[in-house]
UniProtKB/Swiss-Prot annotation:
Keywords for this protein: ATP-binding, Magnesium, Nucleotide-binding, Transferase, tRNA processing
Assigned protein family: Belongs to the IPP transferase family.
Lineage: Bacteria, Pseudomonadati, Campylobacterota, Epsilonproteobacteria, Campylobacterales
Annotated site residues (Interaction with substrate tRNA) in this chain: 100
Pfam family, one: IPPT
Known catalytic reactions: adenosine(37) in tRNA + dimethylallyl diphosphate = N(6)-dimethylallyladenosine(37) in tRNA + diphosphate
Listed name of the protein: tRNA dimethylallyltransferase
Binding locations of ATP: 9-16
Any GO MF annotation of the entry: tRNA dimethylallyltransferase activity
């Protein structure tokens, strides 16, 4: 009997590794939920499965369009239907996994009308107070710390002049998937932060700067170039944002004052690169870099790590909206998923 499940979790939690392991054991098919992996040419920044992994397991949702081509949630739903048809015809399980909870939410809750974001001077507490008065059904489900949903609620309220929960109930399309079993990888923050830092170091060693240079030269202005990893690389390559010459000069001067001798180890420590990740900066790719060049690369790693950690926090908050899920460690989830598929 055909079965499908969703495996969710924050970025760097190990979703892809676990999904591939289970898919190989059960001869299953994987549908990637990653919003960057849909793009061709974006391999390192998306942490896309490598060639061997793609060859061992049939994947959908990967390398669908070029970076400058349009892709919508509607297109993703079509890809889901292709993946489901393939898996059900082969009578093998379909594992839906990735960090883009928005795609999954649209499929299990229905697709809501697109409403432009309304720029407001109100803070979360003020919007929440309005929601409590106008739409208590919504306010009962979310806290005033949930910036994403509060802004979405207020945008709908201003655009339609209706109670948002009632507007969405009337105008949201029917769910594409019903009764989907959802498994969530739960990782302690300290461990996840270490994984994020290690993955960032590996991305830099793998050549994310070269990948970014190619993308900015060939697809300048494309939407995915504003994503975490590529955005920071673009700033370094073109000396903008956090990598403006004057900012770097001041920071480098401060680092030299902090350390008596500014060697490579002290540069990495200045940017909080952990000792276990030093190896990625001491190999052949960077061993001939001068101190200032390494200083910039270390800052790049620091910024990507910080921004990815912030993304993980947002993903964790968003994933709370998925009800009736099983949340556990990778090891426990592996057992639970195999039990579900048996």
């Amino acid at each position: 009997m055909f079965k499908e499940l969703a495996l969710i979790g924050t970025t760097a939690s190990g979703k892809s590794d676990l999904a591939i392991k289970i898919a190989n054991e059960k001869n299953g098919v994987i549908l990637s939920l990653d919003s960057l992996s849909i793009y061709k040419k974006i391999d390192i920044a998306s942490a896309k499965p490598n060639k061997a992994e793609l060859a061992s397991t049939r994947h959908f949702g990967i390398d669908l369009v070029l970076p400058n081509e349009y892709f919508s949630v509607g297109e993703f739903i079509k890809e889901y239907k292709r993946a489901k048809d393939f898996a059900s015809n082969a009578n093998v399980p379909l594992i839906i996994t990735g960090g883009s909870g928005f795609y999954l939410k649209a499929m299990i809750s229905g697709l809501a009308p697109k409403i432009a974001n309304f720029k407001s001077d109100l803070n979360n507490a003020e919007i929440f107070a309005i929601a409590e008065k106008k739409d208590p059904k919504f306010a009962a489900k979310f806290s005033q710390n949930d910036t994403y949903r509060l802004q979405k609620w207020y945008s709908i309220y201003r655009a339609t002049n209706e109670i948002p929960s009632e507007f969405l109930a009337k105008n949201t399309s029917a769910p594409i998937i019903k009764n989907l079993k959802i498994f969530e990888i739960s990782t302690k923050k300290e461990i996840l932060n270490q994984k994020i830092a290690a993955r960032t170091a590996k991305m830099i060693e793998a050549g994310i700067l070269d990948e970014a240079k190619f993308l900015f030269e060939n697809y300048s202005g494309a939407k995915p170039l504003g994503s975490i990893g590529l955005k920071e690389c673009g700033e370094l390559l073109y000396n903008t944002g956090e990598f403006e010459a004057e900012i770097l000069k001041r920071e480098f001067s401060r680092a030299k004052k902090t350390a008596k001798i500014l060697n490579k180890t002290e540069i990495l420590e200045f940017w909080e690169i952990s000792p276990q990740n030093f190896e990625y900066f001491f190999n052949s790719k960077f061993k001939n870099s001068d101190d200032f060049e390494l200083f910039k690369i270390a800052k790049l790693a620091n910024l990507i790590t910080i921004h990815t950690t912030q993304l993980a926090k947002r993903q964790r908050t968003f994933n709370r909206s998925f009800k009736d899920k099983i949340s556990a460690s990778n090891e426990i989830l592996e057992v639970e998923i195999l039990k579900f598929l048996s």
